[in-house]
């Protein structure tokens, strides 16, 4: 039998966002500021919800969970990217790569389920206000949250296990700023067809399920809103739904474009820009979107500031 002299790679190079040295320090500073604001704002929102009994309702229970997931995703991707802006050696080991991918896939999938859960919560609040406390009880809220995190964990675990069937023996250059799944497939020596198929089936099914849940929830909510005769009631309902609809649009927009865009070198660059948006920018925007136009959150923050001044 012929001896197989193929050397399997256990380290990779992340190309990052730019090859131009003059851009590295400005980008480092920009993303460092974004990361710090993201962490402070999301953790601050969690602390605010935790400490104010008036915010201990399902809407803010899920919002606090979303803030945690946003901080998780940002912390999974951004620190390594910041290090690579300054480091001459942008290597990442296979084990580190797998940990980063699992952590990101877990957070991203959990966020999809949380957005769908929050849409259902708004549907019940608008369409069945009298039954809201009965339907959205503590038991259901905990089960919905557990389902979201368990779904994220299992989805990430399945892809993680399937990645270990791949071998890497030619190029060790990952054209991305973090270990995402598709760039890993592109440098695999093993045929990744099964992996691509599972991404299409599992990730596609999750996105379709969560998007349909959001659309159905807000379609019924919209019809209920339009039946309201009170202008104040209509404004309040739209205000309640507006922040979540904006967050959903920002999150799913780049993902949908990535799936629909044909493969090309230009598409790879655009995919990286889209990845920056939903891994770094959206975790920054979500707490701002949900906080700035939310009277209860603003009032709670104001009371907290007055207590501590």
UniProtKB/Swiss-Prot annotation:
Top-level taxon of origin: Eukaryota
Give the location in the cell.
Answer: Cell membrane
Question: GO CC terms for this protein?
Answer: plasma membrane
Per the UniProt record, which residue ranges are transmembrane?
Answer: 29-49, 57-77, 98-118, 144-164, 194-214, 240-260, 272-292
Q: Which cysteines are joined by disulfide bonds?
A: 97-179
Annotated glycosylation sites: 5
Q: How does it sit in the membrane?
A: Multi-pass membrane protein
Select a single GO molecular function from the record's annotations and give it.
odorant binding
Q: Which residues lie on this side of the membrane: Cytoplasmic?
A: 50-56, 119-143, 215-239, 293-309
Q: Name one Pfam family in it.
A: 7tm_4
| Gene3D superfamilies xref list | Rhodopsin 7-helix transmembrane proteins (1.20.1070.10)
Major site of localization recorded for this protein: membrane
Q: Which residues are on the Extracellular side of the membrane?
A: 1-28, 78-97, 165-193, 261-271
User: What UniProt keywords apply to this chain's record, in alphabetical order?
Assistant: Cell membrane, Disulfide bond, G-protein coupled receptor, Glycoprotein, Membrane, Olfaction, Receptor, Sensory transduction, Transducer, Transmembrane, Transmembrane helix
Q: What does this protein do?
A: Odorant receptor.
Q: Which family does it belong to?
A: Belongs to the G-protein coupled receptor 1 family.
What's the protein name? Olfactory receptor 5H2
Origin species, per record, is Homo sapiens (Human)
């Amino acid at each position: 039998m012929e001896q197989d002299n193929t050397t399997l790679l256990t380290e990779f190079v992340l190309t990052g966002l730019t090859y131009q040295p003059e851009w590295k320090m400005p980008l480092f500073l920009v993303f460092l500021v974004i990361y710090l604001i993201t962490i402070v704002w999301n953790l601050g929102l969690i602390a605010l919800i935790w400490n104010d009994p008036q915010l201990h309702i399902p809407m803010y229970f899920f919002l606090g969970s979303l803030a945690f997931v946003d901080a998780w995703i940002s912390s999974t991707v951004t620190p390594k990217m910041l290090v690579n802006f300054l480091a001459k050696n942008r290597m990442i080991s296979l084990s580190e790569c797998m940990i980063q991918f699992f952590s990101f896939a877990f957070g991203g999938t959990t966020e999809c389920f949380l957005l769908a859960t929050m849409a259902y919560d708004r549907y019940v609040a608008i369409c069945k206000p009298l039954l809201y406390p009965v339907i959205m009880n503590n038991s259901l809220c905990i089960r919905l949250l557990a389902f979201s995190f368990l779904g994220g964990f299992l989805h990430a675990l399945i892809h993680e296990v399937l990645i270990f069937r791949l071998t890497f023996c030619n190029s060790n250059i990952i054209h991305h700023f973090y270990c995402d799944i598709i760039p890993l497939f592109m440098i695999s020596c093993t045929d990744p067809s099964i992996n691509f198929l599972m991404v299409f089936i599992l990730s596609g099914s999750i996105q379709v399920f969560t998007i349909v849940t959001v659309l159905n929830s807000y379609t019924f909510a919209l019809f209920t809103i339009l039946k309201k005769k009170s202008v104040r009631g209509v404004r309040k309902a739209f205000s309640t739904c507006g922040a979540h609809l904006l967050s959903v649009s920002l999150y799913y927009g780049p993902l949908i474009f990535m799936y629909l865009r044909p493969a090309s070198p230009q598409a790879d660059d655009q995919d990286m820009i889209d990845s920056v948006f939903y891994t770094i920018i959206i975790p920054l925007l979500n707490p701002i979107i949900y906080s700035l136009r939310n009277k209860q959150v603003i009032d709670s923050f104001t009371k907290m500031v007055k207590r501590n001044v």
